[in-house]
Amino acid sequence: DLVRSRGLGDVYKRQVYNEDFNKRAAKNMSNSLYGQGLGLTTLQNAGNYASVEPTFYVRGLQSLSSSSPLVLVDGLERDMSLVTPEEVESVSVLKDAAAVALYGYKGVNGAILITTKRGKYNTREVTFTYDHVTNFQARRPKFVDAATYAEAINEARGYEGLSARYAPEEVDAFRNGATGGGASRMYPYLYPNVNWMDETFKDTGISNKYTIEFSGGGDKFRYYTMLGLLTDKGFVKSPNENDGYSTQNKYSRANLRTNLDIDLTSTTKLKLNLLGALSESSRPGESVDLWDMVYSLPVSYTHLTL
């Protein structure tokens, strides 16, 4: 951390290097910056790889206009989600007068400056990295069984002076399940006891990330190239029941980064930065998805008569 006193206030700058943030298996640079800078607050509301990225606050939660800080990658405005931790050399966090002096109005909520790796003179290096991540549901809801649900309905109706919706024999049928006797053996589909959360979702999801880096150079030429591939599969238990369509939450992204440095003369240098990213995502449904449907399934079918 660097704090310098100026006439109009203190200038704050925090610099984080690759060896600090690249110790965790993060999908992108946004997740690697958690807890890495004093005054840098990160908030993430969900774990969806495809559409949810953390929100950054450099001036605290009271940042002006609720705006995120300015993000620059090698001096150009870029989406931080397209940058992988492996390709980053350092990150600088500017706030207050330091950001405003450099970037004007765009820097009123601070600035995050990302510097990517570059090759070194007279060296050769190849690095391969593989991360395998098992994802868990931190707050998975627990559902009661059908019998407890039926008893709760009867109790609630009793408080309102209404008659019970389910007879004692029906509650017993729910409790015994399809392997029980009596009504449940005769009508297994009329008195089901199914935990739809367990039937729909599995306990874990899998993510894999592959990265290969080439760097080096000679006396007047330096290069750095990074190729990355990220794949993620969600928690849907049986996603391929429909022919030709998968209901799984899936996300994949391929990254390419190339930085070239050429010394044309002793005073003239040419730099070339190339960045490419290709991503694909799919999920079950749009306005309605499986996470919502497990809450709306009825405890039993409507009674039918001939």
Regions flagged by a language model, labelled:
Residues 1, 7-15, 299, 303-306:
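Residue-level detector of conserved catalytic or cofactor/ligand-binding positions
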Residues 224, 257, 261-284, 288-294, ...:
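Face-selective signature of the C-terminal outer-membrane beta-barrel domain
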Residues 5-257, 269-271:
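Short, small/polar-rich motifs associated with maturation and membrane association
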